[in-house]
C-alpha cells in the first residue's frame, strides 16, 4: 500500500486540486459562472465560426464560448474549469521536466503555480474563459515543440 502511494502521489495531488476547483466553482462562487454564461452567446453555425475565426484569438473565443454555454449547470461548469486548470498544471509540469526540473515534491508543487494564479485571476468576472483556453493551447504547443523538435529536425 505504501509503495502504491509513493508511485501515485502526483496524480492524486492533481486530482485533489481538480476537486477543489470543482467545489469552489460549484458552491461558493456559482454566481460567477452564471454571470459569464448569461453574457456569452454561441451559435453552432458555419457563418458564426467563420466570423469568429478571422479575428485574432478567434479560435480560443469560439472554443470558450462553446464551453461557457454549459455553465448553467454549475457542477458541469466547475468541471470544465477544473479540467482546463488541471491540463495547464500537467502541461506546465511536462515543460518543467523537459527543462530539467527534478521530480521531487517541491518541483512538482511549482507546477501548480500557473494554475493557482489563473484560478485567482478568474475570480474577476471580466476575465473570460478564452484566456484560459488560449494559455492552455500555447502551453500545449510549447510542449509539443519541445517533445518532437529533435525528431522533426532529423527527418527534414
Map each language-model feature to its residues.
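Start-transfer (signal-anchor) and selected internal transmembrane alpha helices
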Residues: 1-21
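Transmembrane-helix motifs of polytopic, lipid-linked glycan transferases
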Residues: 82-100, 115-116, 139-144
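Specific aromatic-rich, kink-prone transmembrane helix
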Residues: 133-149
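Transmembrane helices and adjacent periplasmic/lumenal helix-loop junctions
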Residues: 129, 147-156
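Membrane-interface helix caps and helix-loop-helix hairpins in membrane proteins
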Residues: 120-130
Amino acid at each position: 500500500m505504501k509503495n502504491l502511494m509513493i508511485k501515485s502521489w502526483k496524480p492524486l495531488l492533481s486530482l485533489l486540486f481538480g476537486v477543489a476547483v470543482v467545489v469552489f466553482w460549484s458552491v461558493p462562487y456559482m454566481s460567477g459562472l452564471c454571470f459569464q454564461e448569461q453574457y456569452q452567446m454561441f451559435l453552432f453555425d458555419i457563418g458564426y465560426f467563420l466570423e469568429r475565426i478571422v479575428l485574432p484569438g478567434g479560435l480560443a473565443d469560439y472554443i470558450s464560448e462553446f464551453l461557457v454555454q454549459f455553465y448553467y449547470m454549475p457542477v458541469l461548469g466547475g468541471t470544465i474549469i477544473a479540467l482546463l486548470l488541471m491540463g495547464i498544471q500537467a502541461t506546465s509540469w511536462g515543460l518543467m521536466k523537459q527543462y530539467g526540473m527534478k521530480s521531487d515534491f517541491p518541483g512538482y508543487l511549482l507546477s501548480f503555480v500557473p494554475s493557482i494564479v489563473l484560478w485567482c485571476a478568474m475570480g474577476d468576472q471580466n476575465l473570460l474563459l478564452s484566456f484560459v483556453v488560449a494559455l492552455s493551447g500555447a502551453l500545449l504547443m510549447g510542449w509539443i515543440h519541445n517533445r518532437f523538435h529533435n525528431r522533426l529536425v532529423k527527418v527534414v
